[in-house]
Amino acid sequence: MGPAFNRLWAGSIVSNLADGVLIAAAPLLAITLTDSTVLISIIGAMVMLPWLLFAIPIGALVDRVDRRFILAASNAIRSAVIGIVALGIATGHVTIFWLIASAFVIGICEVANDTTAQSLIPQILDEEHYEKGNSRLQISETVIQGFIGSPLSGFLYALAMWLPFFINSIGYAVAMLLALSIPIQYLQDVRVESSKENKPHFVEDIKFGIKYLYNHKVLRRLVVTTATIGVCYSMGTATMVLFIIKELELAPKYFGVILTIQGLGALLGAIVAPKASKKFGRSIMMTIGITGSSVILLAQGFAPNIYIFVALATLGGFAIAQWNILLMATYQTVIPNELYGRIHGTRRTLVWGMMPIGSVLGGVLAHYSLRLPMYVGGIIASVIAISSIKFFMSIASKTEAAQ
């Protein structure tokens, strides 16, 4: 796949290890700081809110500067913020509001990191390798986060509450160094040399990204549909840690193990996605992924015990991994590389930027019943996905024709 992709992949592996540790430790820390379902859901909302506020300008920035520096800066800031949280825990000064503020900053860095990484794929790989490249990144994310990061987090958390956050901070620092070592020629260098005098203003870049997506009818519908379903997913999962621990009565020390088991489905989905797409067609597998995961979200609300819940979550992970990998390959095929940052930023503003609404709604619904967010989110997502099957089934041919 080449040295550029290998460095990107290595950085992704390290940052995913840090993410896995944080994903398991942060909810456990949160429920020791507050019993409020609304405050806990706000943490998830704060991670997603930057997609609404900053994805478009960050996307434009990604198309204008050396992308290594954006990756490095985002990891450096995450390292510093989580390091401060670890210090706050160790000294007994951390509060739920401190955690909420940190989640917002981490969310901004996630916007920059994700947008930049996705923009690099079509720059460093040939089109026929898009699905393979995305699959490798997804597999490493699933394996490292789910099978190493989460169990490691539980072990570290048992030793000392601050320890997983300290390790998380170190991981992001290493990812920063790896990002700076990626050996590729960047688009900005080409743009400056070829059109230095006519280089568009930053604001014009932002406007162009919005206009491009709006005028592309197929991409526009795909983004709007995905964004709506994303709100439902966010609603259904906002307080899931409380559901698992309080409703299904799982001991907190086993929470990381549950995340690991759930990751099996996502791992299998990531491995199978490129081969299944080649054999059955991208449109068919995308349709199965989005529809199946929506129905499974609803079914999770009816889980009578932790065993049924984990089985459903594992199937859901398989379906979502299929969808994510093939969706990214579709976007990377359709959107011109030199425009990818702007278009990706606009798309993520709608898709991920709307998720905080779902998180807050999920927290409000959970106040009445911890199962209610999954009922409501699952029903709405399933209705939208099923009613869009015809569109999803034709998505590959439509996007190719729309180019």
What is each residue range found by the language model?
Residues 1-50, 215-260:
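Helix-loop boundary and gating motifs at the non-cytosolic
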Residues 34, 66, 88-89, 303-304:
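Helix-breaking motifs and short loop linkers at transmembrane-helix boundaries and internal kinks
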Residues 5, 37, 67, 96, ...:
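Membrane-helix interface/capping residues of multi-pass secondary transporters
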Residues 96-101, 107, 132-191, 260, ...:
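Hydrophobic alpha-helical transmembrane segments
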Residues 1-6, 185-224:
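Juxtamembrane intracellular "pre-TM" segments in multi-pass secondary transporters
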Residues 6-23, 47-62, 66-81, 98-157, ...:
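Substrate-agnostic recognition of the 12-TM MFS/MFS-like secondary transporter fold
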Residues 8, 24, 39-41, 70-71, ...:
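Alpha-helical transmembrane segments and their helix-entry boundary regions
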Residues 53-57, 70, 74, 84, ...:
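C-terminal transmembrane bundle of multi-pass solute transporters/carriers
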